[in-house]
């Protein structure tokens, strides 16, 4: 996944994607914050709606503006309902989200259910980059129980313990973005997390 809440340059985004693809043999998926994130250099993109935003730009306007470009580029799209909870971080601030409190899992279930009924194949529960605590296992479990869409969870997951807790609760994809930016021995930490998750399977 390549992207973030403060990406402002399409040229920069394309350069980053090309550099990654030149060094890593795995698909690169765009995690967009607006139309500046779109690049044909990627393999696919999350075509997402920030469901609890108070601003229609993040709900549907940016998607409508960007859709013709996405179709022209022939990018594979992965429809996602994006839900910001708890801390929220930069994503919550930039996206003008009405952040769902950690202790209100029923609200997350309601938004996730709406995403599923709208045909979104993925649901992302986001606590925000660098969140002091991750999405609670109770909230993850509640959404997993009521929704069949693939469940993505991110924000505040810094170690194997937190990743395993999210997986046991029902997360099917786990995002550890800020870890790459903050950890000096990033490969060791990622290996620790992936090894623990594989062993828990």
Predicted regions and their residues:
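Catalytic cores of alpha/beta
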Residues: 30, 34-47, 146-176
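Conserved anion-binding
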Residues: 37-116
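Alpha-helix-loop-beta-strand connector modules within alpha/beta enzyme cores
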Residues: 10-34, 66-78, 133-159, 190-201
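Glycine-rich phosphate-binding active-site loops on the catalytic face of alpha/beta enzymes
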Residues: 1-7, 44, 48-59, 127, ...
């Amino acid at each position: 996944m390549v992207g973030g809440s403060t990406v402002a340059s399409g040229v920069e985004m394309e350069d980053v994607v090309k550099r990654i693809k030149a060094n890593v043999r795995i698909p690169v998926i765009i995690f967009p914050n607006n139309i500046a994130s779109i690049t044909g250099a990627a393999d696919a993109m999350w075509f997402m709606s920030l469901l609890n935003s108070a601003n229609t730009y993040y709900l549907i306007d940016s998607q409508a503006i960007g859709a013709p470009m996405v179709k022209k580029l022939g990018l594979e799209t992965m429809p996602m309902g994006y839900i910001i909870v708890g801390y929220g971080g930069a994503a919550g601030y930039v996206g003008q989200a009405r952040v769902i409190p950690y202790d209100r899992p029923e609200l997350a279930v309601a938004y996730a259910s709406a995403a599923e009924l709208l045909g979104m194949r993925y649901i992302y529960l986001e606590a925000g980059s660098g969140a002091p605590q991750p999405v609670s296992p109770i909230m993850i479990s509640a959404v997993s129980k009521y929704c069949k869409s693939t469940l993505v969870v991110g924000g505040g997951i810094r170690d194997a313990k937190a990743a395993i807790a999210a997986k046991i609760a029902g997360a099917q994809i786990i995002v550890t973005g800020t870890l790459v930016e903050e950890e000096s021995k990033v490969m060791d930490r990622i290996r620790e997390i992936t090894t623990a998750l594989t062993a828990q399977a």
